[in-house]
């Protein structure tokens, strides 16, 4: 059955990559959450999508140039209603300490394709192991060298190739990393029924992103996609129940 992942939490309605968005995503029926991680100036793993703080918080500047003590003072609901003014940027450990008490999948996207954070892989893996969620985590990144490093450091933790491009002989490429998941962009030529079938036959799990149109959700469910990432998990969950 197709797994629903709340992309940055239930980010279509709530401030993305916040504890509120993750909680609402699971409440909406998602099978898992997707989150993004960057490193602060002092090496803390924070959950935020952009390299800069500007778009989603009340602060400005690069995450990498800002100490965590300053990041934690920010309002992480920039652009949202004042009712969310007390929402903060979570640490990865905040999310994992909440998740460990529940039962859902956790896709951690390492945001290290623009800024190559030294030691990010080791820090993320240490946190995953410390909270004993290795069997529930999927590691993904656009930086496939980083994914290969994760494979060497922790071969037992699931990995997925994240891409916005069409990969030539994608199944062979994914196996060479090695990884067992393929996370392509929903509107790319890499997301066809033929590709889905070929990947599944090769035991590669296909989970496209970001799937917000009901017609795309329905197509993936009918094609037997292993999963999808959506900002609106309640819509995808409702469609899945009707299949």
UniProtKB/Swiss-Prot annotation:
SUPFAM superfamilies in UniProt: PLC-like phosphodiesterases
InterPro entries registered for this protein in UniProt: GP_PDE_dom, PLC-like_Pdiesterase_TIM-brl
Entries under PROSITE patterns matching the protein: GP_PDE (PS51704)
Record-annotated GP-PDE domain positions: 2-240
GO biological process: lipid metabolic process
One GO MF term attached to the UniProt entry: phosphoric diester hydrolase activity
Coiled coil: none
Protein name: Uncharacterized protein YqiK
The organism's taxonomic lineage, starting at the top: Bacteria, Bacillati, Bacillota, Bacilli, Bacillales
Protein encoded by which gene: yqiK
């Amino acid at each position: 059955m197709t797994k629903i992942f709340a992309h940055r939490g239930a980010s279509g309605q709530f401030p993305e990559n916040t504890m509120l968005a993750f909680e609402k995503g699971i409440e909406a029926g998602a099978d898992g959450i997707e989150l993004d991680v960057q490193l602060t100036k002092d090496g803390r793993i924070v959950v935020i999508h952009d390299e800069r703080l500007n778009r989603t918080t009340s602060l400005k500047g690069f995450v990498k140039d800002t100490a965590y003590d300053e990041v934690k003072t920010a309002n992480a609901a920039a652009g949202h209603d004042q009712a969310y003014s007390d929402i903060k940027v979570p640490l990865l450990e905040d999310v994992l300490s909440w998740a460990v008490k529940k039962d859902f999948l956790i896709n951690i996207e390492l945001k290290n394709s623009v800024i190559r954070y030294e030691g990010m892989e080791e820090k993320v893996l240490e946190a995953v192991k410390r909270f004993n969620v290795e069997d529930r985590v999927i590691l993904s990144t656009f930086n496939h060298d980083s994914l290969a490093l994760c494979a060497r450091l922790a071969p037992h933790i699931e990995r997925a190739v994240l891409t916005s491009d069409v990969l030539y002989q994608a199944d062979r490429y994914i196996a060479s990393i090695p990884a067992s998941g393929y996370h392509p962009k929903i509107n790319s030529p890499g997301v066809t029924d033929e590709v889905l079938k070929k990947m599944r036959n090769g035991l590669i799990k296909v989970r496209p992103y970001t799937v917000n149109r009901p017609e795309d959700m329905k197509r993936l469910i009918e094609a037997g996609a292993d999963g999808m990432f959506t900002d609106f998990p309640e819509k995808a969950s409702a469609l899945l129940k009707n299949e």
